[in-house]
């Protein structure tokens, strides 16, 4: 089965600002900026979608009951019926649901055995629109990985690997993480331990951060500094308690791919790498 990790979603208190941040720093693009459809989405606190040419990001306006932050990711498969068949056969406790037709990416929604939600679709699905139907393009700055912290990383990695034929990348023997790749984008499955949060605020299992590959980490640092001066609204979120902030950043920095860590205006942790 050919599988592409081509989507993730953010729930945001200010989704227009959050999308603008990724446009400004990583040159991500909207499909129809300024269109009536987009303006209606903004007026109704719905969502906007941006893309690096391969991975689409839907930034959703926060509604009552929604938890802000990285919300879910999505995969595109070449045979969605076969993917659903595998999941239902091997993991009967996992639910797969048809999604409403107004979702720009998700044709189906499902979850892994620990309850982490993900979207499932295939090329040509009738619901797909916006950045998710545009031709692929290359650009110097692109989404490189997502990190998912779980209680049982071996079992969850097996679920995604065997259900969707993602390739497991090589790693050091002492590395507790699993690296599942479609050849371009990587899903990192990492252990969640409460002890990792000693001395800092505790966060639940789930998506931890997003990583971008860039042409020059130093250039990104300079552009972030300039952005703070030019448009303070787009400055990153900080943790007021210094020691707790250092502890949380250290967790993000443990990613083998990351060279520099920061956060978006909404507090989404981001790391960047050149290789």
Say what each PLM segment does.
Residues 52-53, 69-74, 79, 114, ...:
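Polar/charged low-complexity regions in secreted precursors and cytosolic/nuclear IDRs
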Residues 37-44, 67, 102-106, 173-176, ...:
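Short acidic/glycine-enriched loop/turn segments that link adjacent beta-strands
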């Amino acid at each position: 089965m050919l599988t592409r990790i081509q989507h993730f979603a953010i729930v945001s208190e200010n989704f227009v600002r959050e999308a603008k941040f990724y446009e400004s720093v990583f040159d991500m693009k909207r499909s129809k900026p300024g269109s009536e459809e987009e303006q209606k989405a903004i007026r109704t606190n719905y969502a906007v979608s941006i893309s690096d040419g391969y991975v689409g990001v839907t930034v959703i306006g926060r509604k009552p009951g929604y938890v802000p932050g990285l919300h879910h990711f999505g995969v595109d498969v070449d045979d969605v019926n076969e993917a659903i068949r595998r999941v239902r056969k091997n993991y009967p406790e996992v639910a797969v649901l048809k999604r409403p037709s107004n979702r720009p990416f998700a044709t189906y929604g499902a979850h892994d055995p620990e309850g982490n939600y993900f979207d499932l679709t295939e090329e040509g699905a009738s619901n797909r629109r916006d950045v998710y139907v545009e031709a692929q393009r290359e650009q110097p700055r692109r989404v490189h990985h997502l990190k998912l912290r779980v209680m049982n990383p071996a079992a969850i990695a097996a679920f995604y690997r065997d259900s969707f034929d993602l390739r497991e990348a090589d790693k050091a023997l002492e590395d507790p993480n699993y690296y599942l790749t479609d050849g371009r984008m990587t899903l990192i499955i990492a252990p969640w331990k409460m002890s990792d949060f000693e001395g800092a605020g505790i966060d639940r299992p789930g998506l931890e951060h997003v990583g971008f590959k860039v042409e020059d980490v130093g250039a990104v640092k300079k552009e972030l500094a300039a952005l703070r001066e030019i448009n303070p609204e787009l400055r990153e979120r900080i943790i007021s308690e210094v020691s707790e902030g250092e502890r949380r950043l250290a967790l993000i920095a443990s990613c083998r791919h990351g060279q520099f860590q920061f956060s978006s205006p909404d507090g989404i942790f981001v790391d960047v790498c050149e290789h």
